[in-house]
Every structure is written in C-alpha cells, then in structure tokens.
Swiss-Prot record:
Name this polypeptide is given: Protein shisa-5
Annotated gene: Shisa5
Subcellular location as annotated: Endoplasmic reticulum membrane; Nucleus membrane
Similarity annotation: Belongs to the shisa family.
Cited PANTHER family: PROTEIN SHISA-5, SHISA
Chain's role: Can induce apoptosis in a caspase-dependent manner and plays a role in p53/TP53-dependent apoptosis.
Taxonomic superkingdom: Eukaryota
GO cellular component: endoplasmic reticulum; endoplasmic reticulum membrane; nuclear envelope; nuclear membrane
Region of interest (Disordered), residue spans: 76-130
Species of origin: Rattus norvegicus (Rat)
Notes concerning its domains: The proline-rich region is required for endoplasmic reticulum localization.
Keywords, alphabetical: Apoptosis, Endoplasmic reticulum, Membrane, Nucleus, Transmembrane, Transmembrane helix
Regions crossing the membrane: 3-23
Bias kind Pro residues: ranges: 76-96
Biological process (GO), any one: intrinsic apoptotic signaling pathway in response to DNA damage by p53 class mediator
C-alpha cells in the first residue's frame, strides 16, 4: 500500500470517528449522551414582584350647574406699570376681500386656433407602393 492510500484511510477513519461522536452526543439513546447530559435541577434566579392595585380615591362628582357660565368675550388687560405698550392696535384685522373673478383657465377659441381636432375620416388613404 502506498503513502496516499494510508493517508486516505486514516482521514476516512478520523471523519467517521468525529461523525460518530457528534451523532452519539445528539442521540438520546446513546450511552455518552446519557452520561454527559444528565438532567440538572432547575434553579430559578428570577425574583417575582407582586403588584397590588389599590383603588385610587376618586373625586366626588359635581352636578353640572345649568345654565353654565356664558362667554363674556375678550377683555384686554391694561399694560402693567413699567412695561411698554403693545406696538400694534388691539383690534381685529379687516375682512378679506373676495377673490376677483378672472378669465377661465381654458379658452376654446385660443385652443382651437393652434391645432385642429383629430378626425380619422380626414386622413389620407395609404399610398400604394410602386
């Protein structure tokens, strides 16, 4: 037997041995699995916190008084002593003017003058090839 055959046989035996060990450690019926993977007692390192919800004191419901308070409008406050007055008058802005009516966005007369409408009835018939 030559050197190459000896190396091939040795390598094959090594691969088979490693495969057997892997299969034996993963199979539950193997003696190596039973010896190395004994069931261990489960130890809990977690703590349990119990939260107790107590009733939050609710305020006594107040019966609504009808009619409710009415809105009295805006009353500007007088400026405080030593503070400058507001640089703008305290009044409402003028109402917006209505938009002026401008020309429509599409004019048929201008659009018709630039290009005639397409009508397939006016197309030239196909020309015969001589």
């Amino acid at each position: 037997m030559g050197f190459g055959a000896t190396v091939a046989i040795g390598l094959t035996v090594f691969v088979v041995f490693i495969a057997t060990i892997i299969v034996c450690f993963t199979c539950s019926c193997c003696c190596l699995y039973k010896m190395c993977c004994r069931p261990r007692p489960v130890v809990s390192n977690t703590t349990t916190t119990t939260v107790v919800h107590t009733a939050y004191p609710q305020p006594q419901p107040v019966a609504p008084s009808y009619p409710g308070p009415t809105y009295q409008g805006y009353h500007p406050m007088p400026p405080q002593p030593g503070m400058p007055a507001a640089p703008y008058p305290t009044q409402y802005p003028p109402p917006y003017l209505a938009q002026s009516t401008g020309p429509p966005a599409y004019h048929e007369t201008l659009a018709g003058a630039s290009q005639p409408p397409y009508n397939p009835a006016y197309m030239d018939p196909p020309k015969a090839v001589p």
